[in-house]
């Protein structure tokens, strides 16, 4: 994986273990555009990186056995659990909640019941979030889970959240996202004191709406004050101005998709330029090694695996259209988070932040209008 890692401490169930000791990951074998073929091939790649891991592979038994027969490395770490159905990519979350025997639901059940410490699915995002909130449930002190992911920048990697789980947020949600993003960067990127920025329309303190200014005030007066950079703008995301960028799910999703589109456009334009004539083609031969390194660095498969943070277990969403290498990256994220006590880190941060209750109370005294919207 591209990420640096810290050493493990506690499992999601609270039992002490190290990364060398076995743990179980529940995997939705039927999710995603590629279905079991991509999932099992991805697990075969992940098996080389995590030989001590155990996977509870959930889905249609006959189909999964057929795929495992083609991938002995995956078969060596997998135990199949049959599921009678799969959640379609276009099913509404409310409908998905009623399908109790789906591969996605049984994967969540395995985490909730302590059989597995984490879950990975390439399936329906909305259904996955709804099931995670109902089945796995949120951590104490967290009002809403958020979707977080890692993206490349000019200075390394940045953690961004929320990327679509919560379209509308208040200042409390943004503060919680900052706590969870800081814990994510510590556990997954190995940063001892990640810097935090609130995404805004300008870096000046007076810019933005009331909820952004309230969240900034709370963070400036919290135990994260030394790490809080203040407001950041869109260009700061790729510049690597901060290690964590916090925003609401609507803005975060738009920023994410805009960045992905800009990257695709840049590669299309480069191809057009280097095919425009003989000299351009000769120039391509000279710069090809550097372009290949850049392509590898920016390969979205390396960063596949968005995480629903704030839940009572590790829940990782793989991109539905990824290939085996991309799915393996999502499995890497889940396995690394399980072994590196990610949720324990969030619990510690929540308690260290002078407690969220005290922060909220102080903010309401400072901003009387806050109580009215609480």
UniProtKB/Swiss-Prot annotation:
Pfam families: FA_synthesis. The keyword Cytoplasm applies. GO terms for molecular function: phosphate:acyl-[acyl carrier protein] acyltransferase activity. One of its GO terms (biological process) is phospholipid biosynthetic process. Gene3D superfamilies: Isopropylmalate Dehydrogenase (3.40.718.10). Keywords: Cytoplasm, Lipid biosynthesis, Lipid metabolism, Phospholipid biosynthesis, Phospholipid metabolism, Transferase. InterPro entries: FA_synthesis, Phospholipid_synth_PlsX-like. Its main location: cytoplasm. It catalyses: a fatty acyl-[ACP] + phosphate = an acyl phosphate + holo-[ACP]. It comes from the Bacteria. It is found in: Cytoplasm. The keyword Lipid biosynthesis applies. Pathway: Lipid metabolism; phospholipid metabolism. Its EC number is 2.3.1.274. One of its GO terms (cellular component) is cytoplasm. Catalyzes the reversible formation of acyl-phosphate (acyl-PO(4)) from acyl-[acyl-carrier-protein] (acyl-ACP). This enzyme utilizes acyl-ACP as fatty acyl donor, but not acyl-CoA. Belongs to the PlsX family. Homodimer. Probably interacts with PlsY. This is Phosphate acyltransferase. It comes from Gluconacetobacter diazotrophicus (strain ATCC 49037 / DSM 5601 / CCUG 37298 / CIP 103539 / LMG 7603 / PAl5).
């Amino acid at each position: 994986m591209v990420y640096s890692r810290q050493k493990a401490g506690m499992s999601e169930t609270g039992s002490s273990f190290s990364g060398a000791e076995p743990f179980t990951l529940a995997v939705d074998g039927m999710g995603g555009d590629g279905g079991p073929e991509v999932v099992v091939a991805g697990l075969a790649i992940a098996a080389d990186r995590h030989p001590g891991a155990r996977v509870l592979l959930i889905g249609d038994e006959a189909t999964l056995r057929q795929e495992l027969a083609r991938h002995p490395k995956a078969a060596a770490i997998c135990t199949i659990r049959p599921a009678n159905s799969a959640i379609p990519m276009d099913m509404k979350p409310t409908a998905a909640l009623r399908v109790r025997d789906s591969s996605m639901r049984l994967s969540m059940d395995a985490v909730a019941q302590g059989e597995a410490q984490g879950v990975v699915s390439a399936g329906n995002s909305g259904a996955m979030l709804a099931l995670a909130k109902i089945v796995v449930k949120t951590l104490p002190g967290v009002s809403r889970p958020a979707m977080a992911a890692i993206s490349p920048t000019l200075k390394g990697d940045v953690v961004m959240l929320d990327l679509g789980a919560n379209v509308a947020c208040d200042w409390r949600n943004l503060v919680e996202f900052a706590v969870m993003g800081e814990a994510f960067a510590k556990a997954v990127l190995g940063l001892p004191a990640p810097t935090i920025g609130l995404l805004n329309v300008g870096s000046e303190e007076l810019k933005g709406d009331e909820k952004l200014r309230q969240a900034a005030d709370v963070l400036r007066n919290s135990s994260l004050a030394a790490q809080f950079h203040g407001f950041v703008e869109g260009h700061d995301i790729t510049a690597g101005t901060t290690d964590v960028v916090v925003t609401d799910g609507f803005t975060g999703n738009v920023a994410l998709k805009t960045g992905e589109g800009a990257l695709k456009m840049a590669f299309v334009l480069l191809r057009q330029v280097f095919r425009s004539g003989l000299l351009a083609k000769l120039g391509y031969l000279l710069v090809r090694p550097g372009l290949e390194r850049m392509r590898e660095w920016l390969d979205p498969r390396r960063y596949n695996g968005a995480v629903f943070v704030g839940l009572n277990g590790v829940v990782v969403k793989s991109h539905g259209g990824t290939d085996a290498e991309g799915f393996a990256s999502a499995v890497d994220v889940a396995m690394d988070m399980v072994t590196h006590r990610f949720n324990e880190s969030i619990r510690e941060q929540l308690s260290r932040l002078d407690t969220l209750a005290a922060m909220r109370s102080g903010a309401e005294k400072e901003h009387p209008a806050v109580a009215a919207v609480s």
